[in-house]
């Protein structure tokens, strides 16, 4: 089970986008995450008349290392660490380390 999943709200802890918040769009296999509005890059595209796409400069998100983001805890309003807890019925759930509340209930 991964500590950061798709649709989690995260805060960037280091880099040019430090202290910005965003929602995780995708978790890549190599330990990187794609976060909405974070680590924006400009891609120069050629026009393609076959597809009807115009050329120009397109701004899109680039992946960021998962170690450079922390999950956002809405109860404290700060970044938090994620831990795991096994319930009585044997299911494994993610919890916030500071409050011991389940992440998936938010």
From Swiss-Prot:
GO terms (BP aspect): translation
Molecular-function annotations in GO: rRNA binding; structural constituent of ribosome
Keyword line: Ribonucleoprotein, Ribosomal protein, RNA-binding, rRNA-binding
CDD domains attached to this UniProt entry: KOW_RPL26
Pfam families reported for this sequence: KOW, ribosomal_L24
HAMAP family cross-referenced by the UniProt entry: Ribosomal_uL24_B
Family: Belongs to the universal ribosomal protein uL24 family.
Subunit structure: Part of the 50S ribosomal subunit.
Physiological role: One of two assembly initiator proteins, it binds directly to the 5'-end of the 23S rRNA, where it nucleates assembly of the 50S subunit. One of the proteins that surrounds the polypeptide exit tunnel on the outside of the subunit.
Name this polypeptide is given: Large ribosomal subunit protein uL24
Source organism of this protein record: Marinobacter nauticus (strain ATCC 700491 / DSM 11845 / VT8)
Gene: rplX
